[in-house]
């Protein structure tokens, strides 16, 4: 399965203001090589991934991520096998332990992930090591990602984390971080948009603990995030500035980046921004 260099990450409705535009098909036509979306917080594998696959012809569709608390390994394995029957070798399963505030009983997440992977291996369908990635942040989960999956899909991370992740994974594993983009050159507007996006994640201990491990302190995490934190986690500015910041992840060891655009106005899919970004990012 060839993931390519640049994918997009989007968890809200894949619907443009112009309803005649099929967003997934257009992203493929623009040259993005993978479409990532959240697996949600409900049992089962969302049927939405099948819709993305049906709307496209060759891009990889990936879950970023499916939480292991809501669906059994057997059910998930069967759902992925059903997708693979219809769209062979085009679905990449991203798995994660999610976050304690979102899970009713959140105990021993690392051990639970190990057991989950064991069960997927026993199921012997299509969710083999090379067809899955883990949402690794900390060293233990990153090590597990390298040992038991194709690699890691970290979310809400600066390039410094990409450097660390590559060191832990070694040279043979996939590293595909989510990278947040705000295509706005005004610093005040850009950081305001970034902070609105970041608010959800700064309330989740897995993310804040990870940021602390990278040297960010209480002052950085308070008040929606310091300028230093915003500038580290979010690539903002004009096109050249954004591409330069995204390139830092490649230089730090990323094989593939999953670009999540924060819209400059609330509403539908940021189609204009992804159109503007595509030629520059694909040439980076």
Q: Language-model segments: what does each one mean?
A:
Residues 1-284:
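Active-site-adjacent structural elements that line small-molecule/cofactor binding pockets in enzymes
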């Amino acid at each position: 399965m060839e993931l390519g260099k640049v994918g997009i990450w989007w968890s809200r409705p894949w619907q443009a203001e112009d309803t005649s535009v099929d967003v997934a098909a257009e992203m493929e036509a623009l040259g993005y090589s993978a479409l990532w979306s959240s697996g949600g917080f409900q049992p089962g594998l969302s049927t939405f991934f099948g819709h993305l696959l049906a709307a496209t012809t060759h891009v990889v569709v990936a879950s970023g991520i499916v939480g292991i608390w809501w669906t059994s390994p057997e059910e998930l394995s069967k759902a992925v096998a059903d997708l693979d029957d219809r769209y062979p070798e085009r679905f990449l399963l991203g798995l994660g332990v999610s976050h304690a505030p979102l899970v009713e009983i959140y105990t021993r997440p690392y051990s639970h992930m190990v057991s989950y992977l064991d069960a997927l291996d026993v199921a012997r369908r299509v969710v083999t090591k090379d067809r899955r990635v883990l949402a690794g942040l900390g060293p233990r989960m990153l090590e597990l990602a390298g040992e038991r999956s194709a690699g890691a899909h970290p979310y809400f991370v600066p390039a410094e984390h990409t450097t660390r992740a590559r060191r832990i994974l070694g040279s043979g594993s996939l590293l595909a971080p989510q990278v947040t983009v705000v295509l706005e050159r005004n610093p005040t507007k850009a950081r305001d948009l970034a902070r609105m996006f970041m608010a959800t994640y700064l309330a989740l201990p897995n993310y804040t603990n990870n940021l602390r491990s990278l040297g960010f302190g209480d002052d950085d995490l308070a008040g929606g995030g310091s300028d230093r934190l915003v500038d580290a986690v979010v690539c903002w500015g004009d096109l050249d500035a954004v591409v330069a910041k995204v390139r830092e992840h490649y230089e730090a060891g990323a094989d593939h980046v999953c670009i999540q655009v924060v819209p400059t106005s609330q509403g539908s899919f940021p189609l204009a921004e992804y159109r503007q970004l595509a030629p520059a990012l694909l040439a980076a």
